[in-house]
Amino acid sequence: MEWKSYYTEAADYYKAAIGASQKKTLGNLVIYNVVAMSIENYMTCVLMKTGFIPEHASISGMFRELKKLYEVPEEFQADVRFMNRFMNFCSLEVAPVIVPTDEDVGRMISFVSSLKGWVESCLEIKSTI
C-alpha cells in the first residue's frame, strides 16, 4: 500500500506549511514549495490508490489525470493554475522568480486544505489534523 506513504508525506508537508504560515518561521517562497509538495503528494496518493501511476510530477499534470478518474471540485482548476504562476519549470531560459505575497500564501493554504478534505473523503480517511 504505497499510496499510504504518499498520504503520510502529504499530511506532514501540510502540517509544516500550516505551522510555518501561522508562525511566520519560513519565507513565503519556502512555504509555497512546502505547500506544493503537500499538493503533489495528496494527488499522488489518490492516483496510486486506484492503481494509476502518475505520468507527470507537476501539479497541473496530476490534476489532469485526477479529472480522468474522479469528479474533482471545479474550483480546484483555478487553484492549480494559481499555483503554476509560481512554478519555475526547468528551462534553458532564466525566468524571474515570483515570490508569493502573504495573501498568496493564504490562498495556497486554503487550496491545500480543501484538497486534503477532498482526498480524505475519496480515500475514506478520518483526518487527525
What would you call each of these model-derived segments?
Residues 1-129:
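Terminal alpha-helical segments
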